[in-house]
């Protein structure tokens, strides 16, 4: 069967998501090993020698660098999209969840649900992504599969149900009972887990497995209440229910987001990975199951709903940009409708720019294959796109459709950066430009007043990693300043301004006259600039110049020079001079006018507030809470289990520099914390005065 003819129902677009240390990379690596080693579908059991490298290979921590990898299993094509586990990279998680049809959430059998797992789970809820869970690291000291299932219910509000019962635990973990087939699976150590034996359920687990299976069937009956025949069987004769019936009801429940089945295993010891692959195919949705996609028709601003059809109009979303040393700029896309052919001319409807596809590439675990076309349900890479960035829609030139954008959070931390030598200046500019194209949460701005380049990102780790990439990939050395908080400015009342820009110094002069009205926009909505000019008081050709001037004026605030956000600007009146008016004059005038209006609109400084979760031994709880209060923190709540307490709080980022070190000394190194940007809030007056003085 050629790739082109792949049946839509046989495609799975999935992501593997987890907390940073839950073993996501190992799980992904083993999936690639079992499914991606050969392109012959489902041929896995090579056995013996080819496996030798696995056990000696000490966890190298390979992460798929490619955004999407294609493997084959049980006659299905699985596109795996990688998602990072660290909070500084939430945009990566956002953009991958946006294009997924289903996901596998990996949890650590000892820790269960950790703070970062909650963040990723919330993001998956936002996009309605169906999930199955894999409790990993069952061979670790303190592993507890059932406690992990309970923590999913308590902390995530998930409808988590056990579909396995572990046989043995910690170093004695040898396999699991599959509650659906009612068979015990024992993994053979001599094949490093590649093969297993099906045996009868051990005597000591029979009663427990019968209870667990009945609980699973009861849960499935409530998930699909329309299936009365299944419900009656559960009540009257549960043993008569076939595996096929269970899989059918489970698939429906997973796709409708009503149930989250939980498997167990240990990816490092190769136990349970093939079982996970089987249920990815059996339970997670195909693009067909996910149904219509919603967009806007730009010609009439009406909503459109596109069916996932090969012969439908083209609609694709660019979700990641990568720079490849051999191929150049690669744009990863997901096709929701229609077919995209190599060499075709298309429209980037978000930017209203025409693009041409020079090559189409399908990424396998470690190699790329050229393709002539991608069709509905495919995830792949395009070469040749010049203007497209994360979140842009690609469609046919006569079909102006825009899909829902990917939400991009505002950066919260700034650093000054300069090349180590003058010769590196141009290389640094190229590196910064390429990195900001790849990562929309990484911004580069110039502070003209002090002649500095400022880089902004989602956290210290985020900027450190980008700095490493500059050295490794772009061979450019740079000096960076200390991390600074990325403050913003906004206005709190409405105001207006009337500004004239007039210069007369012999010969042709400069003349522009602009009247603006401004008001606060909804928080998080960004700046909006609208022309309400009627009757040609400012000629049509000068309006874009006024808008550009206003936009540039908002880039530097009126209190301390931080960018203004959430301001709505209406251009309402003005005048011009036949000879002396020019685009430049109106641009300068627009910038002056918006600054004047903002000064009168009670401007304030906003600071990033971080959501922090601290996990600490209970005997240090008082110290941790006291310390957060001293940092202007607002405690949101706390919970305790097994001698450990989790404190959730919101704290200004400016108070959190060096927090990890002070938490270590406060708790003798026994507490851990995670932090993620939450929102921007008004700075207290006293602190605002200090910032302005600086």
UniProtKB/Swiss-Prot annotation:
Domain tr-type G: 9-288
Subcellular location: Cytoplasm
InterPro entries, per database record: EFG_II, EFG_III, EFG_III/V, EFG_IV, EFG_V, EFG_V-like, EFTu-like_2, G_TR_CS
Keyword Ubl conjugation: no
Cellular component GO terms held in the UniProt record: cytoplasm
One Pfam family, short name: EFG_C
Residues forming coiled coils: none
Main localization category: cytoplasm
BP GO terms, sorted: ribosome disassembly
Protein name as catalogued: Elongation factor G
Organism (species): Chlamydia abortus (strain DSM 27085 / S26/3)
């Amino acid at each position: 069967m050629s790739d082109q003819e792949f049946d839509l129902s046989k495609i799975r677009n999935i992501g593997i998501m987890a907390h940073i240390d839950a073993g996501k990379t190992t799980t992904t690596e083993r999936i690639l090993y079992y499914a991606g080693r050969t392109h012959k579908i489902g041929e896995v059991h090579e056995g013996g020698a080819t496996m030798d490298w696995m056990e000696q290979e000490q966890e190298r921590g390979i992460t798929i660098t490619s955004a999407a990898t294609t493997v084959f299993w049980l006659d299905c094509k699985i596109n795996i999209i990688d998602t990072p586990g660290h909070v500084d990279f939430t945009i990566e998680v956002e953009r991958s969840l946006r294009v997924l049809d289903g996901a596998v959430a990996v949890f650590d059998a000892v820790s269960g649900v950790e703070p970062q797992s909650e963040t990723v789970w919330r993001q998956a809820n936002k996009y309605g992504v169906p999930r199955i869970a894999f409790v990993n690291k069952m061979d670790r000291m303190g592993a507890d599969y059932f406690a992990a299932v309970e923590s999913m219910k308590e902390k995530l509000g998930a409808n988590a149900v056990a579909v396995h019962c572990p046989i043995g635990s910690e170093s004695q973990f040898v396999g699991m009972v599959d509650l659906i087939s009612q068979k015990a699976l024992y993994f053979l150590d001599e094949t490093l887990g590649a093969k297993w034996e099906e045996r009868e359920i051990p005597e000591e687990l029979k009663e427990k497995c019968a209870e667990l299976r009945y609980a699973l069937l009861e849960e499935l009956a409530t998930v699909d209440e329309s299936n009365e025949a299944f419900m009656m069987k559960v009540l009257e004769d549960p043993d008569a229910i076939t595996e096929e019936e269970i899989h059918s009801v489970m698939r429906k429940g997973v796709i409708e987001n009503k149930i989250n089945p939980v498997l167990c295993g240990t990816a490092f010891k190769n136990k349970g990975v093939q079982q996970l692959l089987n249920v990815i195919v059996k339970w997670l949705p195909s693009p067909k199951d996910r149904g219509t996609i919603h967009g806007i028709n730009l010609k009439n601003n009406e909503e459109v709903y596109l069916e996932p059809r090969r012969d439908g109009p083209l609609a694709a979303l660019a979700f990641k940009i990568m720079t490849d040393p051999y191929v150049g700029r690669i744009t990863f896309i997901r096709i929701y409708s229609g077919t995209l052919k190599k060499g075709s001319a298309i429209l980037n409807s978000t930017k209203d720019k025409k693009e041409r596809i020079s090559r189409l590439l399908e990424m396998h675990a470690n190699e790329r294959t050229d393709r002539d076309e991608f069709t509905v349900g495919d995830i792949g890479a395009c070469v040749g796109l010049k203007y497209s960035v994360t979140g842009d829609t690609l469609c046919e030139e006569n079909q102006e459709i825009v899909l829902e954008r990917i939400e991009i959070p505002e950066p919260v931390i700034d650093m000054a950066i300069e090349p180590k030598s003058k010769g590196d200046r141009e290389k640094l500019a190229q590196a910064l430009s390429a990195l900001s194209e790849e990562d929309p949460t990484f911004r580069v701005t110039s502070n003209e007043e002090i002649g500095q380049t400022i880089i902004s990102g989602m956290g210290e780790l985020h900027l450190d990693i980008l700095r490493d990439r500059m050295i490794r990939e772009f061979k450019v050395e740079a000096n960076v300043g200390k991390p600074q908080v990325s403050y913003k400015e906004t206005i709190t009342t409405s105001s207006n301004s009337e500004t004239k820009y007039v210069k007369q110094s012999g010969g042709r002069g400069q003349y522009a006259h602009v009247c603006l009205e401004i008001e606060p926009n909804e928080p998080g909505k960004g700046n909006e600039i609208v022309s309400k000019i009627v009757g040609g008081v400012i000629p049509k050709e000068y309006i874009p110049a006024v808008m550009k001037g206003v936009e540039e004026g908002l880039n530097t605030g009126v209190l301390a020079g931080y960018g203004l956000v959430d301001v709505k600007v209406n251009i309402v009146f003005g005048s011009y001079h036949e000879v002396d008016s020019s685009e430049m004059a109106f641009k300068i005038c627009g910038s002056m006018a918006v600054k004047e209006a903002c000064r009168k609109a009670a401007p304030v400084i906003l600071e990033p507030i971080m959501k922090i979760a601290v996990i600490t031994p209970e005997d240090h709880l008082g110290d941790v809470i006291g310390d957060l209060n001293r940092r202007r923190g607002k405690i949101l709540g706390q919970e305790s289990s097994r001698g450990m307490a989790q404190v959730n709080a919101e704290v200004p980022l400016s108070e959190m520099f060096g927090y990890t070190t002070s938490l270590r000394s406060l708790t003798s190194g026994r507490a851990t914390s995670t932090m993620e940007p939450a929102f921007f809030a008004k700075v207290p007056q006293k602190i605002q005065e200090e910032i302005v003085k600086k």
